[in-house]
């Protein structure tokens, strides 16, 4: 498998409730469109799914980049009509942060300290 095929992205999706609809109307729409079977599409994993009171739901998926359009189509097919949507493609910063922290500590121990921005 190529390294490109193994790469994934994170996609955070804000599903903002249409507040003109009550919960029963929202759930009815989602059931009628097959939301619970269709989303997320095969190959996309749920990294987190949270309810934010007064806003709606925030879903973060981990998926290969080639599935981005599939996720978009499923949102259009199933969620539109009860949710306004916003999408935020992201990446996992943990490894980068850990590397930067190690480099900073090493520079500090050597007395050179981290590079400081110029005023």
List each language-model region with its residue ranges.
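Short S/T/G/P-rich N-terminal loop/turn motif that feeds into the first structured element of a domain
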Residues: 1-40, 50-56, 63-69, 91-119
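A short linear hydrophobic-aromatic micro-motif
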Residues: 42-49, 84
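Short, compact, well-ordered microdomains
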Residues: 66, 71-77, 82
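Conserved short beta-strand edge segments in small beta-sheet-based binding/regulatory domains
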Residues: 79-92
């Amino acid at each position: 498998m190529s390294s490109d095929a193994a790469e994934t992205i994170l996609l955070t999706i804000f599903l903002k409730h249409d507040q003109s609809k009550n919960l029963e109307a929202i759930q009815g729409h989602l059931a009628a469109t097959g939301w619970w079977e269709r989303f997320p599409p095969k190959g996309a994993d749920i990294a987190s799914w949270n309810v934010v009171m007064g806003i709606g739901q925030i879903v973060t998926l981990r998926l290969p980049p080639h599935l981005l359009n599939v996720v978009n189509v499923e949102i259009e097919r199933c969620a539109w009509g009860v949710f306004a949507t916003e999408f935020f493609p992201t990446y996992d910063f943990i490894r980068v942060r850990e590397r930067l922290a190690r480099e900073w500590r090493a520079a500090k121990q050597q007395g050179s300290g981290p590079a400081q921005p110029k005023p």
